[in-house]
Amino acid sequence: MVYSVGLTGNIASGKSTVAEFFSELGINVIYADKIAKELTSKNTPCYQDIISHFGSSVVLNNGELDRKRIRDIIFSNSNERLWLESLLHPVIREKIEEQLIACTSPYCLIEIPLLFNKHHYPYLQKVLLVIAPLESQLDRIVKRDHCTKKQALAILATQPNLEQRLEAADDVLINESGLSELKAKVNKLHQKYLREAKIKQ
């Protein structure tokens, strides 16, 4: 199987931008969140399980899941979050493996927001952690989710702590300056992963 790097980091740390930069360099990127969205689309087995568990209050008028409502529930109740993770994570891991087999680039990047235990993903060779200053994260969440700073802090409070993240990480990318500096850091890591994957340019 292709050499693979797990990309992770807390919400609003800049993971998606980092993933885009790797993609621009010709690297296949697999998005765990995108897979999760497909797995929970209308009338899928996971969709039915979620409705059976949470009830009709999590369904919009068009029959789709009310993802904001579900997010509010799991951010305020750790048991509900664990239930949802135990439903989705095994299936997500399976789908990631299927996409890895089809990967055509020298190595593959897998964006997994909640990755803090590499053992759950035996096909990962490396874990790349993106971290950003707290204020930057809060600003991004407030702008993206149109929420208050207090709500943004509550969202961040549900994320794995930095110590856990660092323990699982092989490489750490600090996103604290502009995009050009971030791009330069990605370029450096790209060269490193090419070497590690034993691929000559």
From Swiss-Prot:
Keywords: ATP-binding, Coenzyme A biosynthesis, Cytoplasm, Kinase, Nucleotide-binding, Transferase. Its main location: cytoplasm. One of its GO terms (biological process) is coenzyme A biosynthetic process. It is found in: Cytoplasm. It catalyses: 3'-dephospho-CoA + ATP = ADP + CoA + H(+). Pfam families: CoaE (PF01121). Its EC number is 2.7.1.24. GO terms for molecular function: ATP binding; dephospho-CoA kinase activity. Signal peptide: none annotated. Pathway: Cofactor biosynthesis; coenzyme A biosynthesis; CoA from (R)-pantothenate: step 5/5. Residues 4-201 form the DPCK domain. ATP binds at residues 12-17. Belongs to the CoaE family. Catalyzes the phosphorylation of the 3'-hydroxyl group of dephosphocoenzyme A to form coenzyme A. This is Dephospho-CoA kinase. It comes from Legionella pneumophila (strain Paris).
